[in-house]
Amino acid sequence: MSRINKNVVLALLTLTSSAFLLFQLYYYKHYLSTKNGAGLSKSKGSRIGFDSTQWRAVKKFIMLTSNQNVPVFLIDPLILELINKNFEQVKNTSHGSTSQCKFFCVPRDFTAFALQYHLWKNEEGWFRIAENMGFQCLKIESKDPRLDGIDSLSGTEIPLHYICKLATHAIHLVVFHERSGNYLWHGHLRLKEHIDRKFVPFRKLQFGRYPGAFDRPELQQVTVDGLEVLIPKDPMHFVEEVPHSRFIECRYKEARAFFQQYLDDNTVEAVAFRKSAKELLQLAAKTLNKLGVPFWLSSGTCLGWYRQCNIIPYSKDVDLGIFIQDYKSDIILAFQDAGLPLKHKFGKVEDSLELSFQGKDDVKLDVFFFYEETDHMWNGGTQAKTGKKFKYLFPKFTLCWTEFVDMKVHVPCETLEYIEANYGKTWKIPVKTWDWKRSPPNVQPNGIWPISEWDEVIQLY
């Protein structure tokens, strides 16, 4: 009996020891080895995430463009925002030193790049080589809007977008074109009938839903996920431009029709006024841009752009609009420092503010401040001799870029509604006699300033 008990005890001890040994082996394999192995693999330069479809597509695209000397730069808002958040790390990363894919491996359907078309020397050869490398490429072309004012050239087509797909990821190459105002423009990505709508999820594209205008970015080269790429030197400035980049063209065909019906005024006085008004608009834009105050063409200046793509020669002033929330207290001083003395100041920031500055050659700059209500916007007017107040109502609007007298400027996107509010349905007919208190269909009385406030709200210089 004693002998049996000893054998049982010995067997139990052996079994327990074996179980403990197995546990130690399991623990080492699934915990310590994993932990230490990760450290070892990292120290040996393991490249985590570099097998992703997104990274491989971007790498191949960069190889393609680099070999063909195609000067592309990254404009993808998602990637640029990530780069900006880790900018110091990105700037200090050398080629090939990255061990983990942090940017180009982020899940997404597209990666957006851009190029400036005037720098592209071998477009056709590039397209063929891209397809030989395994990309399926789609080219979007359309008429060059810069030539719409020239009858003999208005049908010329230019490339606007390329979409090159590799496996399940696509590169969207946005083609930027130079415009007269020293800015970059891209066109609308409009699909023609023969194009396969299922080629890529077009609705997820971040560029091309409408034409866009951007400041010309200064570029710098950085290493991102082991790949050398060009990016805007100020990534967030470009990213912040994207949602506000919508661009609308001047209506060149309608302007030509207008001048066929109403001959253009090419007298010495008209030419001189247009020259002075253009210089005044350029100076005003430079001053407000320096302050960071957005503005748009308003009243007669906006009508001139929309109706005839030019300054109305008998208007005798330049009109700009500014949202009151964008008002800055140093606006007056900034204009005065630019050589534009204050001519009058009506109203106050809380109500009906209007500023007027004197330009050269008796051309006046009028700045109207707009106030937003629940279902409309308005700007105010004041009659100096009586203190009467007036209000001009407009349907709500947003701002778009356009090109006017060789400048990139804002206009209301809903331009027709804006023009009709101010000038009625007959805005196409030139009217040289205009009473600012009675002629506009959107004007209404708005009370009278208390005499005790006149020194503040009616200032003439």
Swiss-Prot record:
The UniProt record lists the keyword Nucleus: yes
An annotated GO BP: protein O-linked glycosylation
GO molecular function: phosphotransferase activity, for other substituted phosphate groups
Ranges for region Required and sufficient for interaction with POMGNT1: 6-27
Location (main, coarse): Golgi
Statement: the UniProt record of this protein carries the keyword Membrane: yes
Catalytic reactions of this protein: 3-O-[beta-D-GalNAc-(1->3)-beta-D-GlcNAc-(1->4)-(O-6-P-alpha-D-Man)]-Thr-[protein] + CDP-L-ribitol = 3-O-[Rib-ol-P-3-beta-D-GalNAc-(1->3)-beta-D-GlcNAc-(1->4)-(O-6-P-alpha-D-Man)]-Thr-[protein] + CMP + H(+)
UniProt effect for mutating residue 125 to S: In a patient diagnosed with Walker-Warburg syndrome
GO cellular component terms given for this protein: cis-Golgi network; endoplasmic reticulum; extracellular space; Golgi apparatus; Golgi membrane; nucleus
Quaternary state and interactors: Forms a complex composed of FKTN/fukutin, FKRP and RXYLT1/TMEM5. Interacts (via transmembrane domain) with POMGNT1; the interaction is direct and is required for normal POMGNT1 location in Golgi membranes.
Function: Catalyzes the transfer of a ribitol-phosphate from CDP-ribitol to the distal N-acetylgalactosamine of the phosphorylated O-mannosyl trisaccharide (N-acetylgalactosamine-beta-3-N-acetylglucosamine-beta-4-(phosphate-6-)mannose), a carbohydrate structure present in alpha-dystroglycan (DAG1). This constitutes the first step in the formation of the ribitol 5-phosphate tandem repeat which links the phosphorylated O-mannosyl trisaccharide to the ligand binding moiety composed of repeats of 3-xylosyl-alpha-1,3-glucuronic acid-beta-1.
Family the entry assigns: Belongs to the LicD transferase family.
Protein name: Ribitol-5-phosphate transferase FKTN
Taxonomic path: Eukaryota, Metazoa, Chordata, Craniata, Vertebrata
